Amino acid sequence: MMQYLPEIYLLLLGFTVFMYAVLDGYDLGVGILLPRNDVAQRDRMIASIGPFWDANETWLVLAVGILLIAFPTAHSLIFTELYLPTALMLIALIMRGVAFDFRAKAKADHKDHWDLCFKIGSLLAVLTQGYMIGRYVVGFESAPEAYAFAVLSALCVAAAYVYIGGAWLVLKTEGELQVRAARWSRKAGWLAALGVLSVSLVNPWVNSAVAERWFSFPEVILLAPIPIIVFATILVVDRYLKRVPTVNDAGVQWPFFGVVLIFGLSFLGLAYSFFPEIVPGIMTAQQAASSPETLMVVGIGVVIVMPTILLYTFFVYRIFKGKATDLSYL
């Protein structure tokens, strides 16, 4: 058991990052989608994420904590290489936090400025996260094609977050805003599909180890269902979004859950490409892990904290299910 602790922590880290991508992904996407010329719709969009967004970001804190304590060597390397985009991401998240609270107190003629700040912060956070994923996947190589891949990754992540953000709004809103959200999500979905296809082709090209894992026989046969299910789900989600609005909101939950499935399969493919490496092409989980004694002690905290966050997340989403209503701090 002790010898497998690094791999167990790597799986926990992957799960935590996935939860962050889904939960904070949709509220970042909603932030990007804030319309410029409709205050009422902006208010309703912000209200749709208001009860959840602080809890959603908890998963990012947990992921960084696991990386720092369980894999300190990898933590040092990753954040040394990604110092600038990490700083920009933190600035963007601070912008979002400040704008979110201040817009609730601001006078009407100042609300537009805070909404713009929230939108810019959301977009900057998404682009930096996508760029960091791209740099990480290629093992921080400095070749021009590696940086181009990181830029492609940033655009793909932005499309994916808008995709899930639009699907969330379809679930949580109604009327004209719901119809607009479905239209936004459909457009972003096809951009995300193009991005997934591009990354799936480019990643094996820039990383021979990934190409060998995916295209060797019989692995290529066993793994073929993953991309097939992803693109089939994109088609199904698009079909549901095209039907919005529906009678009695029938089926409006399925686009969001469909996009979550797409995210999950994409993460599964990424995990298969690199496991058990924690930094692709540089170090494995075993090489980067803390001592077994440290991992055992940390495990006590993880066993307490992760279920608590899961239960709290379930509780919040259970309490605030249904359509978004006005959000106020007054």
Predicted regions and their residues:
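N-terminal signal-anchor module of multipass membrane proteins
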Residues: 1-55, 61-64
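Hydrophobic alpha-helical membrane-insertion segments
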Residues: 257-269
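Membrane-interface helix-loop-helix modules in multi-pass inner-membrane proteins
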Residues: 50-123, 136-141, 214-221
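Short, membrane-exposed interhelical loops at transmembrane-helix boundaries
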Residues: 279-298
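Extramembrane terminal tails and long inter-domain/linker segments of multi-pass membrane proteins
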Residues: 1-6, 33-37, 41-50, 104, ...
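Transmembrane alpha-helical segments of integral membrane proteins
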Residues: 98-104, 235, 272-285
